[in-house]
From Swiss-Prot:
Pathway: Amino-acid biosynthesis; L-arginine biosynthesis; carbamoyl phosphate from bicarbonate: step 1/1; Pyrimidine metabolism; UMP biosynthesis via de novo pathway; (S)-dihydroorotate from bicarbonate: step 1/3
Keyword Glycosyltransferase: no
Record flagged with keyword Nucleotide-binding: yes
Lineage: Bacteria, Bacillati, Bacillota, Bacilli, Bacillales
Annotated organism of origin: Bacillus cereus (strain ZK / E33L)
Region (CPSase), start-end ranges: 1-166, 1-169
Catalytic activity: hydrogencarbonate + L-glutamine + 2 ATP + H2O = carbamoyl phosphate + L-glutamate + 2 ADP + phosphate + 2 H(+)
Gene designation per UniProt: carA
This protein's name: Carbamoyl phosphate synthase small chain
Residues passing through the membrane, by range: none
Length: 365
């Protein structure tokens, strides 16, 4: 079955269709991960995107029940050079092709993914549509140019609060499109977690008496989530806070800094990040299309703690006065290296120190 990818600039790439027999549009991006395709397609941060894999063979270990980062996949399509039809792994339960058919997600194989990746790197991310061969190219191009992809966080965030009980510190996890890996890391440390929707107010969060607040990853432009920015303005300084990815960007906006869209984003499992204070470099998992503008941090109460070695963009922030820090990358990995996993320990240490300071103030009052 032939299928084509039509880009907003009129480029047409023809290959072999697999997965769902459905047409879908989305922002065409690329990821450099050699493995972790199951985590990628189930990562809510990819909501509404058509993901191109630069690694030439995808699907060789199939799909299993353990590696999902969300219950429902949020990607709008997959593009690969070659898909493996006969996966081999002791955990395999279903092939990638069959899984995409079940979930009605279209795929395209047999195209030059290196050519497509170079195009995205040169011109930036492009809107595109995976469609059948009888599609009207001119009409689709006109539709793509007029399309604006918004409200992704609203689509992937939980609709209702729910608990993930533990005996340790109570952490309110604000879900902007949370990967399950973040929740797993908190559960490992016996945190008493309450997951809340993206539009939960500061008053509602504080009513839960949290020891700490965690801001999850999520898709899209952080400026599309004004409710969260307003919530954070009222939260910062009252409770220890740790943010990841979109949570990092929202924290920056709430603190007076600015964000902007990257040309082609950071998506992959091998991005080097430097800790400015120690000089140490961690290899990190990343997935974001926006970043905090370095110059916008200068007139705020924030300091830059980490930078990307590939392009110098901001990868970490810390508040100068209050117990709050954030990172642009994914310390929980899932998939990817676990070089930065100790940030969860830093968060819990910050909570304990904040509690001790509060107890000392009460004793001295």
């Amino acid at each position: 079955m032939k299928r084509q990818l039509i880009l907003e600039d009129g480029t047409v790439l023809i290959g072999t269709g697999f997965g769902g027999e459905i047409e879908k549009s989305g922002e065409v991006v690329f990821t450099t991960g050699m493995t972790g395709y199951q985590e990628t397609l189930s990562d809510p941060s990819y909501c509404g995107q058509i993901v191109t894999f630069t690694y030439p063979l995808i699907g060789n270990y199939g799909i299993n029940r353990d590696d999902f980062e969300s219950i429902h996949p949020s990607v709008n399509g997959l593009i690969v050079n070659e898909i493996c039809d006969h996966p081999s792994n002791f955990r395999n339960e279903i092939s990638l092709n069959d899984y995409l058919k079940e979930r009605k997600i279209p795929g395209l194989a047999g195209i030059d993914t290196r050519k497509l990746t170079r195009k995205i790197r040169q011109y930036g991310t492009l809107r595109g549509r995976l469609c059948n061969m009888d599609a009207d190219v001119e009409y689709i191009v006109s539709q793509l140019k007029a399309t604006v992809f918004t409200d992704h966080v609203k689509r992937v965030s939980t609709k209702d609060p729910y608990p993930s009980p533990g005996r340790g510190h109570r952490v309110v996890l604000v879900d902007f499109g949370m990967k399950h890996g973040i929740l797993r890391e908190l559960n490992k440390r016996d945190c008493d977690v309450i997951v809340v929707p993206y539009n939960t107010t500061a008053e509602e969060i504080l009513r839960l008496s949290p020891d700490g607040i965690m801001l999850s990853n999520g898709p899209g432009d952080p400026k599309d989530v004004p409710e969260a920015i307003e919530m954070l303005k009222d939260i910062i300084g009252k409770v220890p806070l740790f943010g990841i990815c979109l949570g990092h960007q929202l924290f920056a906006l709430a603190s007076g800094a600015n964000t902007s869209k990257l040309k082609f984003g950071h998506r992959g499992l091998n991005h080097p990040v430097k800790n400015i204070a120690t000089g140490k470099v961690a290899i990190t998992s990343q997935n974001h299309g926006y970043a905090v503008e370095e110059e916008s941090v200068e007139n705020t109460e924030l300091e830059i703690t980490h930078v990307a070695l590939n392009d110098g963009t901001v990868e970490g922030l810390r508040h100068k006065k209050f117990p709050a820090f954030t990172v642009q990358y994914h310390p929980e990995a899932s998939a990817g290296p676990e070089d930065a996993n100790d940030l969860f320990e830093d968060f819990l240490t910050m909570i304990e120190n904040f509690k001790k300071e509060g107890e000392e103030l009460c004793q001295n009052a």
